[in-house]
Amino acid sequence: MAGTAHQHGRQPQAGGRERSPATVWESAALIALALILCTPFLYLLRSSHSVHPEPVSENRFIGSEACGACHQPSFDQWQNSHHDLAMDIASEATVLGDFNDIAYTDPHNQVTSRFFRQGDKFMVETEGPDGTLQTFEITHTFGVYPLQQYLIPFPGGRLQCLNIAWNSRDNRWYRVPPYDVKGTDDWLHWTKGGQTWNGMCAECHSTDLAKNYDMDTDTYQTTWFEIDVGCEACHGPGSNHAEWAKKPAMARSRIDNAGLVVDTSDISSSRFISICAPCHSRRYQLGDNRHQAEDVLDTMVPSLLEEGLYYPDGQILEEVYVYGSYAQSKMFRHDVRCSDCHDVHSLKLHKEGNDLCLQCHRAAEYDRYEHHFHQRQFEGKPSDGHLCVKCHMPARTYMGADHRPDHSIRVPRPDLSESLATPNSCSTAGCHADKALSWVTDHYNRWYGASKKPHYGDLIAAARAADPDAAEGLRTLAGDALSPVIVRATALSLLRNYPGPATTDAMIAALEDDDSLIRHTAIRGLQNLDLQTRLTHIAPKLYDRVKGVRIEAAAALASVPKTSLKDDDVEAFEAALREYQAAMRYNADFAPQRYNLGNLAAAQGDNDKAIGYYQQAIKIDDQFYPAKVNLAMLFNRTGNNEAAANLLREVIAGNPQLHEAVYSLGLLLAEMGKLEEAAELLGRAADSMPEYTRPRYNQALALLKLKRYEEGEQALLKALEVEPANREYFSTLANLYLSFNLIDRARTLVETTLEKVPDHAEALQLRDLIRQNRTPP
C-alpha cells in the first residue's frame, strides 16, 4: 500500500489552511538536518546492498522444522498434507493397514498373503522372488490416501514396493495393478525392477534424495535428507536463507532471493510450473534434482503424447500424472499456474465445486443451466452433472483406487469418440455410460451445434496408423506456434516415420525453436541422416543452454569421426557426451538406458561393449524387445546369424504385433538362404504394414529366387499400387515380363504407370522400346 500512502501525503491539510512562510522554513531546516544525519546510514545501506555483497556460503539442507520456526502458518498447512505423509517409517502412528493376522487372496494369481505383527514389527507372508511363500518385514509406509503402500528391504540396498496395498478410502487390502505379470521373472513382479522404490518412486517422495545407483555392481546406496516431501523439496536447501534471516533487517546483505536456491516469487507461470513438473509428470530424470535448473529439460525429459500413454486426442490413458495433460490446456497457455487452484502447502483446492473455477470464469455465463444443461437435482436426488470438472476434467482410476482428473481441461468432444474411439466425459461411468454414443452426440449437437473445430487428435491418430497423407499436416502442426508445445513436439516426433526432404526441412527449422522440447525432438528426428547434415545442423546444439538438448546432440553425433568436427566443437562434443553418459548411467537401473549406452557404443564402433550393454538391458527386463532387436542386428553384423535369428524369433513369439521384427527376421533368413521361411515372414510383414512397400518388394525378390514367378509378380504389383513412382519396383517387374517375353503385360505395366506418373523415366523408355518392337538385351 506504499503508493496509497504516498498519494495521501500529497493531500491538502485539514480545512485547507495554508502554512506560513516561517513554518515552511522550519520544515525545510528539519528536512535538511534529517538528510545530513541520515546520509552515512544511507551510504552504508547502499554499500551493503549493492556494491560489495557478502560472499554466499554453500547451501545446505536444514529440514522443515527449521523452516517452520519462522514460517509457522505455511508449516502448519504443510503438516499432514500428502507431501508431509509421502513416506515414513512404519510404526503404530503411520501404518494404516490391518495387520491383525489378516489373510488376503489375490484374485489375479490366487496367492494368499497374510498380514501380521511380530512384536513392534509389521510383517507379511507372501510370494517371494522364487515363487514360494516367504515372510518379510515392512519397514516403511508409502503414501497415505486413497491408498497406502508398503516397502520391504531387499539385497543390494533395494526397497521393494509390495503389490498389495491398503485402500484407505474403503479400509481393505487389495491388489495394485498391473495384473498381467508373467511370473516372478517378470520385470513388473513386485520383487523386480519395475517395483524397486529406489528407481521408480523415491525421487518424488523424499527431500534431497540421492539415488546412488552403481551400475557395475547393480546396487544402491540411496540417501535422503528428509524422508518426506518437505519445504526444501520445492524451495531448495535453506541454510543460506536461515543465516540471512537471523540477522537484523538492517544488517541483511543483498543476496539473490534471500539466499534461497529456488525463486518462487514474481516468476512466470511456466517457471512456476517447472518447479512442480519434475515430479508431477511422466518423464525420465537426467540426474538427482539439484534445484538449479532454468529449464524443465535441464533435469528431465517429459514423455510426449505417445501411443499407449495418451489417447490420440491427448486425453490421459496410462499413468502420466499431470504435466503432459496440463501442458495441452488453454489454461497453461494463458498463464494459469498450479497455485491458482491448489494451495502450495496444504495442496488442497482453494475452493470447492464450481466456486474454484468461478475465481476466473463468470458465473452468469458458465454456472447456469443454459451452459451445462444439467440440473442440480435429478429425480429427487442431488446431481453433480452441473459441476465444471465433470465435463471438463473427467477422471481415470490409477493404481486401482486413485481417481485422477485429466488436467488438459478440455471441451467434451463426443464426435471424436465416434471417429477416434476416444473417451468423452458424457459417456463416463457415473454419467451416461449406459447410453449409446449416438444418443450422447445427438444431445450434444442439439445443445452446442454440430460444427466442430479441427482437432490435432485426428492428425495424431492418422499418423499413428501410418497414413501417408498425414505428413503435410504433421509438418504444419509442428510449426504452428499457436498450438501447445507438447502437441507440436509430438507431431515432430511422428514425422520421423515420414522421411524425405520436406521432413528434414521441418526438423532443421525446429532446431531454432524457442522451446527446448521442440529442439530436443528435432535432434532425434535428424540423428540418422547423413554425416554432413548432422555436422551442419546438430553440431551447433552442442552449445545449447539446456542440458537435455546438448546431450541429445552429443548422442546424435556419436558416430561422427572427431576429425570431421571443428576444433572448438570437439571440446563441446566431449563435454556434452560426458553429460549424456552420466545421465544414462544415472538411470542404468532401467533397461532403456543400458540400451542407449549400447547404441552409443555401437555408434562408436565398439561392438563388444555394445553387445554387453544390450545383454545387460535384457537381463534387467527380458521383455524389453528393442535391446533384443538391436542385439540381433549386431550379431548379424558380426557374423553370428543363428544367434540373431534366435533372438528375433524370441521377440516375435512374445510380441507378435512387432511387425518390424517380423520384417527383420525375414530379411535375415533371406540372407541366410532360408528363402521359404523368409518369403512367408516377409509376406506377413507386408500384410501387417501395407503402407510400407519395402517388405512387399523383398517378399517378391524371395519368391522370384524360389522361382514362384506368379506370386512374385503379384507382390510387385501390390508394391507398385502403393508406390507407383518407385523405379526399382518398376524395373524389377518389367525385367520379369521381358525375360519371359510377356510383352502385353509389359505394355499394360507401362500404360498403368504413366497414367499415375506421366514423367516416369523408365516407363517412358520401355514404352519407346516396345513401340519400336525392341526390348532390352
Protein language model regions, located:
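Structural signature of tandem alpha-helical TPR/SEL1-like repeats
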Residues: P501-A502, T533-L535, D569-Q581, Q604-Q616, ...
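Helix-start (N-cap) detector for alpha-helical repeat units in TPR-like alpha-solenoids
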Residues: V485, S516-R519, K547, A591-P592, ...
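Amphipathic alpha-helical scaffolding segments comprising HEAT/armadillo-like alpha-solenoid repeats
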Residues: P468-A478, G500-E512, D530-L542, S564-Q581
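Primarily the internal scaffold of c-type cytochrome electron-transfer domains
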Residues: E65, P73-G143, Q149-P155, C161-N163, ...
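Structural marker of alpha-solenoid helical repeat scaffolds
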Residues: Y498, D513, L529, D544-R545, ...
